[in-house]
């Protein structure tokens, strides 16, 4: 019921925060070290702090500016080629997060990367036709779904900071997970070292992790809005990259 309630709140037509993805352990209880002593109903100070990281920092500025609730946009895309990339930096400190986007192409190569700490980079690559996550710390997660068939595929990387877990999904299929705690900075979509062409659509960045049920709904085309900082439909016919999420953050083409 907790997961069902979380999904319901996602689709309410008002701003919301995905608290479940902040400090849940995946089974409806607090992650280890975040419970308030023997009080099973409340988190401790660190737990409340994790809640704040799941809030979009500029949400109220966006509301004050008249920015409304986003809706899903289908049928648009953006081709990245000749070393062009899309770049955004999350507002303020990030702990839990989910990065999700659609890709279509026929070649291997880097599809996204992010800064972690001061001098490490995490990458999402297509290797031998499948998506592979290379951790900025150690290890990798390798998918099993072929994504070089020139069809649309959804790639989702989700990180539970409190649990210390990163999970990779290709479409609705869980590729695997790593035990790690990330402190992410700038995100880059595409590969600024390659001239190869790849098509992208619907870029999402959430300030909260997502479970299997949420990933399924996202792949089904539902508009999940809780803790959403970036939603860029990506439309190559427009001169700028629009962010429809209720935040003041932006995505830049470089």
Task: List where the protein language model places each region.
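Catalytic His-Asp segment of secreted/periplasmic serine-dependent ester chemistry enzymes
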Residues: 1-70
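Extracellular/periplasmic catalytic domains that process cell-envelope and extracellular macromolecules
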Residues: 10-11, 92-94, 125, 181-182, ...
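Extracytoplasmic low-complexity segments
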Residues: 23, 63-83, 117, 216-254
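Extracellular glycan-interaction surfaces
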Residues: 70-79, 100-107, 123-181, 254
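Extracellular glycan-recognition modules
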Residues: 73-75, 79-132, 164-165, 208-215, ...
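Extracellular, beta-strand-rich glycan-interacting domains
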Residues: 98-105, 194-222, 229-238, 247
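Short edge-strand/loop segments of extracellular domains
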Residues: 114-121, 170-174, 222-223
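Flexible glycan-contacting loops in extracellular carbohydrate-active proteins
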Residues: 174-200, 224-229
